Regions:
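Structural/interface elements that position substrates and couple domains in central-metabolism enzymes
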Residues: 1-177
Length: 177
């Protein structure tokens, strides 16, 4: 139980900022391990044998809370004259992951001798997290837009997302799968 509304709000913001930072750490590890040729999920599985290991997975961080609340905290800190380096570093890492995923897909296409321009890529899932209809601040759009810049024909399907809302927010037509 929080002692005041300020304490309750601060608690909620740090819960989301902490999750954001933990995911950013694992995202950064995924980038490093990818460069080393090591499977990140294998590393995380092995690390998970330690009783106090925090089980986070690499991925996109969007939505209306986790990808936003750290900025509220950072803004307030800066307003008070403090520069929150870890919080902002986490945001930078997570905000870059869509581009990173797209660039890795492009590299895979090139390595396999596939044509990048006019390649067809199916993205299964647009909402900011699984099994919900919420598309607010979805970072999947970053992957889509980056692939489109390379001339990739991107098809998107998501049975949870509302077709009209997706078109209104992102100008995308969902494909049926």
């Amino acid at each position: 139980r929080a002692s005041s509304i300020k304490v309750a709000e601060a608690a909620k913001v740090i819960e989301n900022a902490q999750r954001d930072i933990n995911i950013a750490f694992v995202n950064e590890l995924a980038v490093i391990f990818n460069k080393m040729g090591i499977n990140t999920l294998d590393v995380l599985e092995a690390a998970g044998t330690k009783w106090n290991f925090l089980n986070f997975r690499p991925g996109l961080v969007g939505g209306h809370c986790i990808g936003v609340d750290p900025y509220y905290l950072a803004y307030k800190a800066q307003e008070l004259g403090y520069h929150p380096e870890v919080i902002l570093a986490g945001r930078r890492i997570n905000d870059h992951m869509g581009k990173y995923v797209a660039e890795n897909l492009i590299k895979q296409l090139i390595r396999t001798g596939s044509s990048v321009r006019d390649a067809k890529v199916l993205i299964m899932g647009l909402t900011f997290k699984e099994d919900v209809p919420d598309i607010r601040n979805t970072k999947v759009i970053d992957i889509i837009r980056e692939l489109e810049e390379y001339g990739v024909n991107v098809l998107v399907c998501d049975p949870y997302a509302d077709q009209e809302q997706v078109y209104h927010e992102y100008g995308l037509s969902l494909s049926q799968f």
